[in-house]
């Protein structure tokens, strides 16, 4: 448990570098970012947004199983644990959002530029909020259509970031489960992807840096427990002797 907690803590620290740096810098979101950067951020965030998030989940689960070489029974147990970790994280996120009720950056911007009081905005039902955003931004040339559509769908509260929790959970699961097998490329790709998802939430006006920080910390706690459970139920996560030889050979060739 301690080794898993240490590994995932290092991964969480790496994920926290970007949002903490942005937080300290005092950066504030404003519409009108470079179009190519904004479009790239949108497509990165779409890898987590439904329905694509389900596809991402299934692809990553399949890859994890291949890397871990689990038997069928153990595979189903691991799938249940991984799915539970993601679902519990999303449930915790929803509960905190309802309690804290922090407005999104773009909602604050709507209040300043379109005179829509934040309190009144959030008293509306979700569908009504989406329609209001659509009406108010119909003539807004500085906001691309894809971003307007995204805002119409994402009219909930900001704190903490659900997209960050999804991506960070997978990245930290990689650190916890795949590091003993030295799947360093997979770990690096997922850490970069998770950081990209976090950055996209800032650029799209969906979250504040603190939303990302807290979401990452929650993900770390959940993943530490999930990997511990996986080890208790499925057995040691360390590779057997035969696989250790293969890992050593792979490292020599790289």
Swiss-Prot record:
One GO molecular function term?
undecaprenyl-diphosphatase activity
Q: Which Gene3D superfamilies does this UniProt record tie to the protein?
A: Phosphatidic acid phosphatase type 2/haloperoxidase (1.20.144.10)
Q: Quote the subcellular location field of this record.
A: Cell inner membrane; Cell outer membrane
Query: According to the lineage, what is the superkingdom?
Result: Bacteria
Q: Does the keyword Hydrolase apply?
A: yes
Question: Which residues of this protein are catalytic?
Answer: 163 (proton donor), 207 (nucleophile)
Q: Periplasmic topology: which positions?
A: 25-54, 95-161, 203-208
Q: How does activity depend on pH?
A: Optimum pH is 6.5 for DGPP phosphatase activity and 6.5-7.5 for undecaprenyl pyrophosphate phosphatase activity.
Q: Which residues lie on this side of the membrane: Cytoplasmic?
A: 67-71, 177-182, 233-254
Cell inner membrane among keywords: yes
Membrane topology note: Multi-pass membrane protein
Pathway entry: Phospholipid metabolism; phosphatidylglycerol biosynthesis; phosphatidylglycerol from CDP-diacylglycerol: step 2/2
Q: Where is this site: Stabilizes the active site histidine for nucleophilic attack?
A: 211
Region annotation (Phosphatase sequence motif I) ranges? 97-105
Q: Where are the transmembrane segments?
A: 2-24, 55-66, 72-94, 162-176, 183-202, 209-232
Region described as Phosphatase sequence motif II: 160-163
- Recount the PTM note: The N-terminus is blocked.
Describe activity control: Inhibited by Mn(2+) ions. Inhibited by phosphatidylethanolamine (PE).
Q: Per the similarity annotation, which family is this?
A: Belongs to the PA-phosphatase related phosphoesterase family.
- Function comment: Catalyzes the dephosphorylation of diacylglycerol diphosphate (DGPP) to phosphatidate (PA) and the subsequent dephosphorylation of PA to diacylglycerol (DAG). Also has undecaprenyl pyrophosphate phosphatase activity, required for the biosynthesis of the lipid carrier undecaprenyl phosphate. Can also use lysophosphatidic acid (LPA) and phosphatidylglycerophosphate as substrates. The pattern of activities varies according to subcellular location, PGP phosphatase activity is higher in the cytoplasmic membrane, whereas PA and LPA phosphatase activities are higher in the outer membrane.
Cross-referenced PANTHER family, in alphabetical order?
Answer: PHOSPHATIDYLGLYCEROPHOSPHATASE B, SPHINGOSINE-1-PHOSPHATE PHOSPHOHYDROLASE
Note, other: The enzyme active site contains a catalytic triad that establishes a charge relay system. This catalytic triad is essential for the dephosphorylation of LPA, PA, and sphingosine-1-phosphate, but is not essential in its entirety for the dephosphorylation of PGP, the nucleophilic histidine alone is sufficient to hydrolyze PGP.
**What is the protein name stated in its UniProt record?**
Phosphatidylglycerophosphatase B
Lineage per the UniProt record:
Bacteria, Pseudomonadati, Pseudomonadota, Gammaproteobacteria, Enterobacterales
């Amino acid at each position: 448990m301690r080794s898993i907690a240490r590994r995932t803590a290092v991964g969480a620290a790496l994920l926290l570098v970007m949002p903490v740096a942005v937080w300290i810098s005092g950066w504030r979101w404003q519409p009108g970012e470079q179009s190519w950067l904004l479009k790239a951020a949108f497509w990165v965030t779409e890898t987590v947004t439904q329905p694509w998030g389900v596809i991402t989940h299934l692809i990553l689960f399949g890859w994890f199983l291949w890397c871990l070489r689990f038997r069928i029974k153990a595979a189903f147990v691991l799938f249940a644990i991984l799915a539970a970790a993601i679902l519990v994280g999303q449930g915790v996120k929803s509960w905190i959002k309802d309690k804290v009720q922090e407005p999104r950056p773009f909602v604050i911007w709507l209040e300043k530029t379109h005179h829509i009081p934040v309190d009144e905005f959030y008293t509306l039902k979700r569908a009504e909020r989406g329609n209001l955003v659509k009406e108010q931004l119909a003539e807004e040339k500085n906001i691309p259509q894809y971003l307007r559509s995204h805002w119409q769908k994402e009219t909930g509260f900001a704190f903490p970031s659900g997209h960050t929790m999804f991506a960070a959970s997978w990245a930290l699961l990689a650190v916890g489960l795949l590091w003993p097998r030295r799947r360093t490329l997979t770990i690096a790709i997922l850490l970069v992807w998770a950081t990209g998802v976090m950055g996209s939430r800032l650029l799209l006006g969906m979250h504040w840096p603190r939303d990302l920080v807290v979401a990452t910390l929650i993900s770390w706690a959940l993943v530490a427990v999930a990997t511990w459970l996986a080890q208790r139920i499925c057995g040691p996560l360390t590779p057997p002797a035969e696989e250790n030889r293969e890992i050593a050979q792979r490292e020599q060739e790289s």
